[in-house]
């Protein structure tokens, strides 16, 4: 997939190092990145910017990744969302997929896998 337009990715994770790692993965391949440290920040960014895909940690302070995803969907509709979790909890994965997450990835995520999944999601939705 060639990035024929500047797709924007919202990365939401309460760990600053994780956010920066995702920035370092996506910016060099041409994505515009917005970073949020909480669900509330993510919702604010979605209100103010054109976001094409959200990459979200499942465990966030106050609003969980799933709760944030539901609110973002009310604002943006069927925005592709990829949830990430350090937990290997099958129930959590099932809930994420039933909430229409595009994919659920386990931390740590390899650079090549996350780029592949993001590109596939963008191809499918846009």
Language-model features, listed with the residues they occupy:
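Two-component/phosphorelay signaling modules centered on CheY-like receiver
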Residues: 16-34, 99
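Acidic catalytic/metal-coordinating carboxylates
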Residues: 38, 64-67
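Short amphipathic alpha-helix used as the core "switch/output" element in two-component signaling
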Residues: 44, 66-78
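Active-site beta3 strand of CheY-like receiver
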Residues: 49-55, 60
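Alpha4 helix (beta4-alpha4-beta5 surface) of REC/receiver domains from two-component response regulators
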Residues: 67, 88-104
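C-terminal output helix
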Residues: 91, 109-118
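The C-terminal output helix
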Residues: 119-126
């Amino acid at each position: 997939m060639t990035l024929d337009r500047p797709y924007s990715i919202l990365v939401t994770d309460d760990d600053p190092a994780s956010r920066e790692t995702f920035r370092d993965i996506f910016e060099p391949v041409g994505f515009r990145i917005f970073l949020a440290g909480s669900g509330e920040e993510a919702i604010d960014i979605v209100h103010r910017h054109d976001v094409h895909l959200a990459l979200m940690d499942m465990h966030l302070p106050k609003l969980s990744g799933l709760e944030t995803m539901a609110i973002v969907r009310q604002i943006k509709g069927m925005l592709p969302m990829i949830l990430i979790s350090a937990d290997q909890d099958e129930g959590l994965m099932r809930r994420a997929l039933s909430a229409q997450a595009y994919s659920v990835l386990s931390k740590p995520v390899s650079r090549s896998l996350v780029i592949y999944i993001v590109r596939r999601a963008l191809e499918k939705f846009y």
